[in-house]
């Protein structure tokens, strides 16, 4: 199992009815772990409610749930984690002279133990973990706003396998 697959299982997986279930709105991630579920067909499920999106799902009773201390391929794990839980965008703010500028920003969301594990393996300085209140409760984030750090992180994460749609969008910012 690659680090990339471990990240997908860690973030998109859950135990349900005695089986480990992986679901995601992007079929790419279900396809990326499908070889770990050799006898399980995967399927598309319809979501309930007008604001929800349909999602892809695969499940099996014969899969081991990954733990953070079992990760050996940290580059792959971080790539999967940031693809699933990260946002790369342009941040509008004023510089010292008062002009509005747009700077590249990478925000990575998650729970404290996983965020710390990922942040410890990224080529960037230590950041203060921020609390982010959402409609689902509380989550945490690290925000990288230095263009040099963001570029170094994206360069470090670059590799395969990866979700090409996300990387095309990210490359449009670089």
Can you name each region flagged by the protein language model?
Residues 1-174:
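Internal intein/HINT superfamily modules and their associated LAGLIDADG
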